[in-house]
Swiss-Prot record:
Interacts with RAI1; the interaction is direct, stabilizes RAT1 protein structure and may stimulate its exoribonuclease activity. The interaction also stimulates RAI1 pyrophosphohydrolase activity, probably by recruiting it to mRNA substrates. Residues 1083-1101 have a biased composition (Pro residues). This is 5'-3' exoribonuclease 2. A zinc finger (CCHC-type) spans 270-287.
Length: 1127
């Protein structure tokens, strides 16, 4: 989720939630012939962490990214080798947890349109950064050649793997799907510990984000009485939103598993990426960068595997149970609904679907600010902000009003803090430079000798060691340097240049005799080239011409440097050639995602700095344009404009917000200034909004939206869209996708001061269907990544007569928007017009091959079981024996409470051979025999909408927090005892990274204190009703109910008042099966929109619908397929 530093903030504020994972490692034993062999981990042994796990869920994108482009070691050469790395990593994670019932592996499928805006931005920036790095690599090669060294053709033509391939619909994702099926079948056949597992694979052909498909499955399962209320869950992933999603399930026995990104290497402190020395970072380094031979392949460093940690959601619930209690409330406290409010307030700070409000930064304590407002206003609000995934708009207005009162103070304090921080950084940099100068002086003193008044210095002379070795075996070897007078050492390079030029004008014998002088002249040419590359804006045009001419003359006079005509014509950038030839090292300041900046995840957590690249920053921001205006005719650019990194002279004006005002400057080229990205990832630029100065609102709306503050109607549209987004996100987390095609049509958020009449906003969502995979690829890919699309679709991204060419600008603005780090800038890309995109795609569909049409279709979830599983014979007899045509409900007794329905898998033949999908890997041969079976699996219908309650039969775990821990929380982290402290990783006593306390991850003191039970609950565990009206005394608990009558529903102030229509009663009466509205208006289910590809399918996205799999509707009570099969 888009909340950088959330995990760090949580682990610092609630220290006991983090536990170190204990994992068994394979033992090395002596084999029967005396050889050393590795004994595999016995999966059936007890879990070494002291607790057993029922269900393990893997957000596979968090595994695929670090395996395909790892940090600190070379990436696998081929995609088949990447599959092997994914197998190894997945097996390590599974062996840590050892689930006993279900292993679910979910890969991101087509995302909701609201997420595509972020995906589009990240992929365009990834392509831009990849192009910058490739340009820097070529410049470094040119510099290396200018020094007289040869570069192999393989090195010169090497191309990096495009990380954008990790997107649904690409051939890579197709290979990933079949490879995981092969690996799962292999494990079920060869590992006896897997015999009772049910493995569910939801690959990229199944719509939905991986983690949300997992949570949708959990919500559906817990709506049935066969579900065990004490099921133990673990979910793996790098995104911080997994914490929020786990809390939102209201399944209390939940843990989040992730790599400990704060763990320090066992090899000691990290060296500077610039000079290779320890003790400082690259941002404070004064030395020249180390230069590496591009012909030398990078060698993997031998480091211990990174440790893993658990985040205990049950312990986090204990902390929140203390923090969220408000004394003197006029209604009973409900922990579950209070947790929902806490989650909702975090959405204000950041999420993947909306830009955060300008006044809210998590590092400035934004969550605590909102929590303080919530605690102060809760009694006056008369109830909670949220209601089982629905937002009470009137109460949301109260929170926004409280924040609005503090915005001016927040902006001023932010500026003061930034100035103090800059002053402190400047002081540290000066001190560090002084220390480096002293170290350099001491080093020079060691290499200096004074004899008879003459100062001698050491001059490198590699030939000294090649003159026959030592003078005598008893003597040391010759030194690799000569001692010369200092004055001669200074004059030596100039003499070498003159000597080389004279030699070049002579005969071949002169050239041979003066090889050293010629080589040194080559070095001078390289230095001139490097000076031009480093010159930046400080070198004027005449100087650059002079340098270029001088370099050209030297190149013509040097026989060892051969430059092609293309190299002579190639234009050089003005920044230092460093690129991928430099050792990247581990990023300083990484917070969440262990992902390089070019592919920032997600799951985009973290403060990952970007290298010394250049980004474009806008002087005039763009605004959403009239995309859907039938009179709008997009301008076209020539195909040649897509080549290179030259500034574009056209402004894209086809954004799809028909509410945006006309832009009179749309046809004028916007000047772009290149900003230098410093070594620490910061960007130097001038902030033209100045939020800390009076009049900032006028400047903000003029610069960011192109309107005046007095244009109230436009600002109201922005605030309504933003509030729609908050409602959409909350419902997405609790009930499923409200509308697949909704998105926020602006690049920036409004101020809290500008929200007015929120309670009267008419917010509702209409049902829609997800994109097909190729439609998403066209929507999020830049033209540079078109290779992953079928050839007929690639022309849509580059041909000058393409109707959607304007979706793929070759260059785009980066607005730093008051931020410091380059990765925090806003990419001002045009919003895509869905109708134009789908129309263009449809015109090319007939040109696709059968296999490409298969890749462009929605797929099925697949369940795998071993031949010893109780379900095996049932599936063989009823599915493959009779070849069932209708989905068959799963026997919940044989499945241990797991519900759903199944159909035969057309790709599975029981007891047959599974051909390997990666034949180049000898360790992965054909699987014969294959003792597993696979079936198409459909999620069950959701018996009722998800409710924020603990289910009946829940057994609490022993309390983790002591009374002193609770007192520390009540004091806001001030005074008292903080609780058991923990280690941030590494070897034993090594302390953790930023934001982590010292000590060790441990379970804390003995759990002697009993768990404080929640208030009395209804039949289904709900506590104290679902919503509250005026702050009048209410009964201590709602009427006992089994979904009939009872607690209030969506939008009604009094939970005990009779609902005026069938949908108003929320969970007490039949709830709407399609997307619901907000406020007091009754909901009328709309008709689903027509399917742009074929006949309209049933509505998708609401919980009572079928699972993510597809097929014919099953009998009543089973899962069903909301989309007809296209295969």
């Amino acid at each position: 989720m888009g909340v950088p530093a959330l995990f760090r903030w949580l682990s610092k504020k609630y220290p006991k939630i983090v536990e170190r994972v204990k994992e068994d490692t394979p033992k090395k034993i002596r084999g029967p012939d005396g050889e050393i062999v590795e004994e595999p981990i016995r999966y059936e042994n007890p879990n070494p962490n002291g607790f057993e796990v029922d269900n393990l869920y893997l957000d596979m994108n968090g595994i695929v990214h670090p395996c395909t482009h790892p940090e600190g070691r070379p990436a696998p050469e081929t995609e088949e080798e990447m599959m092997v790395e994914i197998f190894k990593y997945t097996e390590r994670v599974v062996n840590m947890c050892r689930p006993r019932k279900v292993l679910m592996m979910a890969i991101d499928g087509v995302a909701p349109r609201a997420k595509m805006n972020q995906q589009r931005s990240r992929r365009f920036r990834a392509a831009q950064e990849a192009a910058d790095k490739e340009e820097e690599r070529r410049e470094a090669i040119k510099l290396f050649e200018a020094m007289g060294h040869a570069v192999s053709e393989e090195t010169a033509n090497h191309k990096s793997w495009d990380t954008n391939a990790i997107t649904p619909g690409t051939p890579f994702m197709d290979l990933l799907s079949i490879s995981l099926k092969y690996w799962v079948s292999h494990k079920l056949t060869t590992d006896p510990g897997w015999k009772d597992l049910k493995i569910i694979l939801s690959d990229s052909s199944v719509p939905g984000e991986g983690e949300h498909k997992i949570m949708d499955w959990i919500r559906r399962q817990r709506s049935y009485p066969t579900w065990d209320a004490n099921t133990s869950h673990v979910i793996y992933g790098l995104d911080a939103d997994l914490i929020m999603l786990s809390l939102a399930t209201h399944e209390p026995h939940f843990r989040v598993l992730r790599e400990d990104v704060f763990a320090q290497s066992s090899k000691g402190p990290h060296a500077c990426k610039n000079c290779g020395k320890v003790g400082h970072i690259a941002a404070n380094c004064k030395s020249d960068k180390k230069f590496k031979d591009p012909n030398v392949a990078e060698v993997a460093k031998t480091e211990d595997p990174k440790p893993f940690i658990f985040l205990d959601v049950a312990c986090l619930r204990e902390y929140l149970a203390v923090e969220l209690v408000v004394p003197g409330m006029p209604f009973p406290f409900d922990l579950e609904l209070a947790i929902d409010d806490w989650i909702f307030m975090i959405f204000f700070v950041g999420n993947d679907f909306l830009p955060h409000l300008p006044s809210l930064e998590i590092r400035e304590g934004a969550i605590d600010v909102l929590l303080k407002i919530w605690r102060a206003e809760l009694p006056r609000m008369g109830g909670y902000l949220t209601n089982h995934g629905k937002v009470n708009l009137d109460r949301a207005q109260v929170i926004l009003e409280g924040l609005a009162k503090s915005e001016d103070e927040i902006f001023q304090k932010r500026k003061d803090d930034e100035e103090r921080q800059e002053h402190s950084q400047k002081r540290r940099r000066i001190e560090e430079h002084k220390r480096q100068d002293e170290d350099k002086a001491r080093e020079e003193d060691r290499n200096t000798l004074t004899l008879n008044g003459t100062e001698y210095v050491a001059v490198d002379n590699p030939a000294a060691t090649a003159r026959g070795g030592p003078l005598h075996p008893s003597l040391p070897s010759r030194p690799a340097f000569d001692l010369v007078p200092k004055e001669d050492a200074v004059k030596q390079p100039e003499d070498q240049d003159q000597k080389a030029k004279k030699a070049m004008a002579g005969s071949n014998s002169d050239i041979v005799k003066n090889r050293k002088a010629i080589r040194m002249a080559n070095m001078s040419a390289a230095q001139a080239l490097k000076a031009e590359l480093e010159g930046g804006n400080d070198v004027n045009v005449d100087d650059k011409k002079a340098i270029a001419q001088e370099g050209k003359e030297e190149d013509e006079a040097v026989v060892t440097v051969e430059r092609t005509e293309d190299e002579e014509k190639e234009q050089l950038t003005k920044e230092e050639a460093r690129g991928t030839l430099e050792e990247q090292g581990e990023k300083e300041g990484v917070d969440e995602e262990v992902v390089p900046p070019a592919i920032q995840t997600d799951e985009d957590e973290g403060e990952a700095p970007v290298g010394d690249a250049t980004v474009a920053e806008n002087d005039e921001s763009t605004t959403p344009e009239d995309d859907e205006d039938p009179t709008h005719v997009p301008r076209k650019r020539k195909r040649g404009d897509s080549d290179g990194d030259e500034d574009s002279n056209e402004e894209d004006d086809d954004d799809d917000d028909d509410d945006a005002p006309p832009n009179p400057e749309a046809d004028q080229p916007i000047p772009k200034k290149k900003l230098k990205v410093n070594a620490d990832g910061t960007v130097d630029y001038e902030d033209d909004v100045k939020l800390w100065e009076p009049g900032y609102r006028e400047r903000y709306y003029e610069k960011k939206f192109g309107v005046k503050l007095s244009e109230r109607e436009f600002i109201d549209k922005v605030t309504k869209s933003y509030m729609e987004g908050l409602c959409w996100v909350l419902e997405y987390y609790y009930q499923g996708v409200p509308a697949w095609d909704w998105f926020y049509p602006y690049h920036y958020a409004p101020f809290a001061q500008d929200f007015r009449d929120v309670g009267s906003m008419d917010i509702k969502f209409e049902t829609s269907i997800p994109f097909k995979p190729f439609a998403q690829l066209l929507g999020v890919f830049p033209a540079a990544s078109r290779i992953h699309l079928p050839e007929p679709l690639q022309t849509l991204m580059i041909d000058e007569d393409s109707p959607i060419l304007d979706f793929y600008p070759p260059d785009f603005e980066i607005d730093m928007n008051g931020k410091k780090m380059a990765w925090q800038g806003v990419a001002l890309l045009p919003f895509i017009d869905q109708n134009r995109l789908l129309t263009a795609l449809k015109s090319k569909e007939e040109l696709l091959s059968d296999d490409e049409k298969r890749r462009n279709s929605w797929g099925d979830n697949v369940m795998f079981i071993a031949n010893e599983n109780p379900l095996y014979d049932l599936f063989c007899d009823k599915l493959y024996g009779l070849r069932a045509k209708d989905p068959i409900p799963i026997d919940t007794k044989a499945s241990y409470g797991i519900t759903g329905s199944v159909l035969p898998d057309p790709n599975c033949v029981p007891a047959s051979t599974f051909d390997t999908p990666i034949p180049s890997i000898s360790e992965c041969p054909d699987l014969n025999p294959n003792d597993s079976i696979s079936v198409r699996y459909y999620f069950p219908r959701q018996a009722h909408p998800h409710r924020s309650i603990l289910l009946r039969g829940y057994k609490p775990e022993p309390a983790r927090l002591t009374e002193s821990d609770k007192d520390w929380v009540r004091r806001g982290g001030q005074g008292g005892r903080r609780g058991h402290r923990h280690n941030g990783g590494g070897n034993g006593n090594v302390t953790g990274g930023p934001g982590m306390a010292r000590g060790r991850y441990e379970s804390g003191p003995p759990r002697t204190n009993g768990y404080q039970p929640p208030p009395p609950r209804s039949n289904y565990g709900g506590s104290s009703g679902y919503g509250y009206g005026a702050p009048a005394p209410l009964p201590s608990r709602p009427p006992v109910s089994s979904y009939g009558g009872g607690a209030g529903g969506y939008g009604y102030s009094n939970p005990y008042a009779a609902a005026p229509n069938p949908y108003a009663g929320g969970y007490g009466a039949p709830a709407p099966y399609a997307a619901g509205g907000y406020g007091q208006r009754p909901y009328v289910p709309p008709l689903p929109p027509p399917n742009p590809y074929s006949a309209p399918p049933p509505a998708y996205g609401r919980p009572p619908g079928g699972g993510y799999g597809y097929g014919a509707p099953p009998p009543r009570g089973g899962g069903y397929n909301p989309y007809p099969s296209r295969r």
